Amino acid sequence: IRDRSVSRGLGDVYKRQDNKCMFDGSSIEGFVRIEESDMYLYPDLNTFEILPWRPQHGKVARFMCDVYRPEGVPFEGDSRYVLKNVLKKAAKMGYTFDVGPECEFFLFHTDDNGQPTNITHEKASYFDVTPLDLGENARRDIILTLESMGFEIEASHHEVAPAQHEIDFKYDEALQTADNIMTFKLAVKTIAKRHGLFASFMPKPKYGINGSGMHINMSLEKDGKNIFFDKSNPMGLSKECYHFIAGLIKHAKGMSCICNPLVNSYKRLVPGYEAPVAICWSSINRSPLIRIPASRGAGTRIEFRSPDPAANPYLVMALCLAAGLDGIENELEAPEPIGKNMYLLTEEQIADMNIDVLPATLGEACDAFEEDKYIQEVLGEHISKKYLEAKRKEWHEYCRQVSDWETEAYLYKY
């Protein structure tokens, strides 16, 4: 559970530093029953940050918080706690997990009442500039805001679809990166609103265009060195890197329910729109689920291409690391890399290559999640049970809906 907030006055700050901020956990879906509702927020003082878009007279700051039970133990339903647990396991093995996300989003117009739409008047595409890129000023304002908060922005540009943008920030340790993603999304939405726009992280807001992803670039360090690199290997990859890839491939289907959490997520994961479908890997080819970018040495990394920006970053990173560690611990063997463009192959051709595919719907993803006991163990019983219940409910509600497509296709004919 993430993406919630509570405000406190300045006179209350000292109490909150002593972890005395109580809230009603039963009022938030997925937390606890009403019989055990009292929960506490423990602020992480390292995450203190002034929000630059708020009035400078009477400034507003924020902390990321961990959730605890009244008896002083971490709440097992806190996704930040889940990530911390997996990071502790990695640390015991001598590893530091570094992550760099590629965050994509859309900037749409609002209607006369200020409500969001999925309308845009621009026709810009990949790497376009003004006057085609109508969102450039908003994107630049977002970047300047993030930089004032300590972000190191590595790149930003217009993406393939009209009104679609990407901003990449510097690699960092996983917990810091997950916190940064939460801050990033808040800043993007806030600054976009100032420009009269609505920022959407919905994976596929319109038919017929590319959806938005949140590719996860990751590496492991040990004793200050990137252990995914091995100059003696023909591809420059270490045995740990191959094992890590194998772990991701093994658990990719079960992870989909977390990495792609919405009904809409699976409208993005279709052939032809630069999103992965086939569970395989490549050194350069961008069509498989996993890609190894060309950089070697300290820059050697694995790019996991299925996650979308609707996903909880703490859980995504926890599962990516846990899957990779499973591969390393059990010395799983990665299949041969794929050089073909997987987007051009049929399902039958992919199956003939003994390559599996990602779930096609949220319902299939729920089934795969339920079958992957290792993934459930990583998340813990509380999150696994509550999350699966919520996603099953979401899927069943969607299946009962009558869409505009159905009305247009069937009403007149039948």
What are these model-derived regions, one by one?
Residues 12-90:
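Glycine-rich, N-terminal phosphate-binding loop and its surrounding beta-alpha-beta segment
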Residues 68-74, 131, 171-177, 224-226, ...:
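A generic structural motif
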Residues 45-73, 98-131, 147-173:
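Residues forming anionic-ligand binding surfaces in small-molecule and nucleic-acid pockets
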Residues 131-135, 139-153, 167-174, 185-201, ...:
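Accessory "access/gating" subregions that flank catalytic or transport cores
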Residues 183, 190-193, 197-198, 221-414:
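Catalytic-core signal marking the mid-to-C-terminal active-site face
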Residues 1-14:
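Single conserved hydrophobic/aromatic residue that forms the stacking wall/gate
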Residues 107-108, 162-168, 203-216, 263-275:
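Beta-rich nucleic-acid/ligand-interaction surfaces
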Residues 120-146, 174-185, 222-229, 234:
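Acidic, His- and aromatic-enriched active-site or binding-groove loops in soluble protein domains
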